Amino acid sequence: MNWKKYINRFKSRDLSENGLPTSILLIIGIIVVSIIVDLFIQKSLLLVPLISSIIISAIITKWGIIKLKKINCRQVVRKEGPSGHFQKSGTPSMGGIFIVPISLILTNLFALSNNTFSKQLVALSFLSLAYMLIGLIDDWQSITLKRNKGLSVKSKVILQTIVGIIFLVLIYSQDLNNTDILIFGNNTINLGLLFWPIALFILLAESNATNLTDGLDGLASGCGAIVFTGLAIELIIRGNNENYAIASFCITMAGAWLGFLIFNRKPAKVFMGDTGSLAMGASLAGVALLTNTLWSLLIMGVIFLAESVSVIIQVGVFKTTKKIIGKGYRVFNMAPLHHHFELEGTKETIIVQNFWLITICFVCMAIMLR
């Protein structure tokens, strides 16, 4: 074997354009944190569902990429996006169609084996699958029409609202909700009837925020895995028996997205599509609503928030200035925020790594502020 040939080939690679090393570090880091939590908290059982979901998700994703290629489910890149993204055109998409069901099956199996199965898990499973289906319809239309646009914004919001209302009716009828919102420390605010419209807004906002974040290889899957892990740890620390099943749900979701990340990091071999991103955001919002961790989710999901706010600012300022002075002004080079940094010349992997690091810092902050 010509070892010199392989060594020279390795040296010639631009490792800054490969997200595998940092993805492996992220996976190892979350595994180590889960081990520490399990060792120091008696009832914590994070490691087994985490490892299981990582392995199974990675296997299913590898198999799924082949299937997606066979049925020609490939990404269509929008013309107005960054020019560097045109090379991503043709990458298999709709990867979330494998990850979401697998994570839900594993979650419910773990819950049944640990006698922690609950109505909350049923509600979360419904919410995740329903939003996945909305994303699936959107992705399928985009692929069949061969354009980077599936459902209209209006249609998507209507479907998300209908599912959100069904979910809220479900948790109300089963008395799974708490209209007291926990903020700093143990301080609470009772929202009363205001809780329900706010809850619906959070479902729509979070699902669309993760959708906007899914614009760089490994960005949404990495950030999502970190936030799910943070929520799982917070719920374990609380020590409430009712929250253990939800903590298991969170860590299984984290593991599933980490397994997916192995193939979604740069250069991505598959994208999650709206099928995955909408389900991810809805799941995070659902967990927060059921476990009174809305404030924690707001802090932990700072990247999701920043991505959404950047779009709101960009569109709002552009339309306002165009109406007033006849010419639209752009605050950012392009929105969402990650595209702004891309056009500034920052490499995609560097943006993703920095956004992961920011998410980790804010997850730690949220846990310390609980």
UniProtKB/Swiss-Prot annotation:
Pathway: Cell wall biogenesis; peptidoglycan biosynthesis
Family: Belongs to the glycosyltransferase 4 family. MraY subfamily.
Name of this protein: Phospho-N-acetylmuramoyl-pentapeptide-transferase
Protein task: Catalyzes the initial step of the lipid cycle reactions in the biosynthesis of the cell wall peptidoglycan: transfers peptidoglycan precursor phospho-MurNAc-pentapeptide from UDP-MurNAc-pentapeptide onto the lipid carrier undecaprenyl phosphate, yielding undecaprenyl-pyrophosphoryl-MurNAc-pentapeptide, known as lipid I.
Chief location: membrane
Domain of life of the native organism: Bacteria
Subcellular location: Cell inner membrane
Top-tier EC class: transferase
